[in-house]
């Protein structure tokens, strides 16, 4: 690696420097997630595929992680300016995929939701990709339209219209969780870019009203809200998943029942290896494990926002917004997943980044980290007076 005080000769390629602490934190989350996916999925794997299939989800998760690392390495080599230049085309691709997933006979339906496109031995979830795409597009949009950031029709309305279209497509799947995350990404980027406080707070006041309407018009969403306040009122139906998640947390106590010793994962807690893996972790590793995971995510967010602030100081507004948008995305999704597992929020169907089972989320999150590392590397080059 090169020291900050030196520059590379013109005929010598510049070797990338990585934020070792950031990369190490992500690898720790991936590693711990892999262990917990295996532990949480043993029972369901053998129930679905027979005895001797306990490694099924472990093998698939490991392959997703390797694929994510491979794709991430490729994306790291792409200059940040490329993502900005092609953000329109990426947006078109994202909207097209959201339309395709709604076509009967093409999409893969699970539990009444059409969120997946079958791809042979696996499937792809377009809403995961859309989180990254709309983040990049919004960052590019607010930079290009900086002169109109306080203008409702020329600056605010177009991005609001886009958010409405994307939200409607997601709600047709339905996927309220992804809708909430994407709305938060867009609003946070616009806020960080300095949009009019009057328009921002006006929209913030409108969001709870829209969320309330979306909850009221769908009885199952209202049931999830009611289950938060008293899951024990109907522990065998509407409160079933939450009561078993809370039991898992209670059994874990301070130090857990031991890795692999969870009772709730034995076909009691639904989605134990995906949306509710955090509850299994709490049962097996206890309060100590919960604090460890929360601390890792907190440290990861600190490093992410540091990259964003550095980019802003170096005059790279697009890179700064992308980096901080990634921080908002991953931080909010982790918060929602943990909150759902603890009974603080209604069930949303959102995975825990880097840890829950799922190929789409692992690969897309890896791409996001690769772009973040690219921003960090370009920051380092700019401090030396070099171009990426």
From Swiss-Prot:
Subcellular localization: Cell inner membrane
Enzyme class: transferase
UniProt-listed InterPro entries: Cell_cycle_FtsW-rel_CS (IPR018365), FtsW (IPR013437), FtsW/RodA (IPR001182)
Coiled coil: none
Gene Ontology terms for molecular function: lipid-linked peptidoglycan transporter activity; peptidoglycan glycosyltransferase activity
Example GO BP: cell wall organization
Cytoplasmic face of the membrane: 1-19, 77-89, 138-151, 306-324, 373-388
Membrane topology: Multi-pass membrane protein
Residue spans crossing the bilayer: 20-40, 56-76, 90-110, 117-137, 152-172, 176-196, 197-217, 285-305, 325-345, 352-372
Disulfide bonds: none
Main location: membrane
Segment forming the signal sequence: none
Gene Ontology CC: cell division site; plasma membrane
Function: Peptidoglycan polymerase that is essential for cell division.
UniProt xrefs under NCBIfam families: ftsW
Record HAMAP family: PGT_FtsW_proteobact
Stored PANTHER family: CELL CYCLE PROTEIN, PEPTIDOGLYCAN GLYCOSYLTRANSFERASE FTSW-RELATED
Protein name (Swiss-Prot/TrEMBL): Probable peptidoglycan glycosyltransferase FtsW
Organism: Nitrosomonas europaea (strain ATCC 19718 / CIP 103999 / KCTC 2705 / NBRC 14298)
């Amino acid at each position: 690696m090169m020291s900050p005080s030196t520059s590379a000769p013109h005929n010598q390629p510049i070797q990338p420097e990585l934020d070792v602490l950031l990369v190490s934190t992500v690898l720790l989350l991936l590693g711990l997630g892999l262990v917990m996916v295996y532990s949480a999925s043993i029972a369901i794997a053998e129930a679905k595929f027979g005895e001797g299939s306990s490694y099924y989800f472990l093998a698939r998760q490991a392959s997703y992680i390797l694929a994510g690392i491979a794709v991430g390495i490729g994306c790291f080599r792409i200059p940040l300016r490329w993502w900005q230049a092609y953000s329109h085309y990426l947006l078109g691709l994202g909207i097209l995929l959201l339309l395709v997933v709604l076509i009967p006979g093409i999409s893969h339906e699970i539990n009444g939701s059409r969120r997946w496109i079958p791809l042979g031995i696996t499937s792809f979830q377009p809403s995961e990709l859309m989180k990254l795409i709309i983040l990049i597009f919004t960052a590019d949009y607010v930079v290009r339209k900086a002169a109109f950031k306080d203008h409702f029709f020329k600056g605010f309305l177009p991005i609001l219209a886009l958010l409405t279209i994307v939200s409607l497509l997601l709600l047709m799947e339905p996927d309220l969780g992804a809708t909430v995350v994407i709305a938060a990404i867009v609003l946070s980027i616009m806020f960080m870019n300095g949009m009019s406080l009057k328009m921002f707070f006006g929209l913030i006041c409108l969001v709870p009203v829209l969320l309330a309407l979306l909850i009221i018009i769908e009885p199952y969403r209202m049931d999830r809200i009611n289950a938060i306040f008293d899951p024990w009122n109907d522990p065998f139906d509407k409160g079933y998943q939450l009561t078993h998640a809370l039991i898992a947390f209670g059994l874990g106590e301070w130090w857990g029942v031991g890795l692999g010793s969870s009772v709730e994962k034995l076909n009691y807690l639904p989605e134990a290896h995906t949306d509710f893996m955090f509850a299994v972790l709490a049962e097996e590793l206890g309060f100590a494990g919960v604090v460890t995971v929360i601390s890792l995510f907190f440290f990861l967010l600190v490093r992410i926002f540091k990259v964003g602030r550095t980019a802003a100081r170096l005059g790279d507004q697009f890179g700064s917004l992308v980096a901080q948008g990634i921080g908002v995305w991953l931080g909010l999704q982790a918060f929602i997943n943990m909150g759902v597992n603890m009974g603080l929020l209604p069930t949303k169907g959102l995975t825990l980044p880097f840890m829950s089972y799922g190929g789409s989320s692992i690969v897309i999150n890896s791409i996001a980290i690769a772009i973040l590392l690219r921003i960090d590397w370009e920051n380092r080059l700019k401090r030396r007076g070099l171009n990426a």
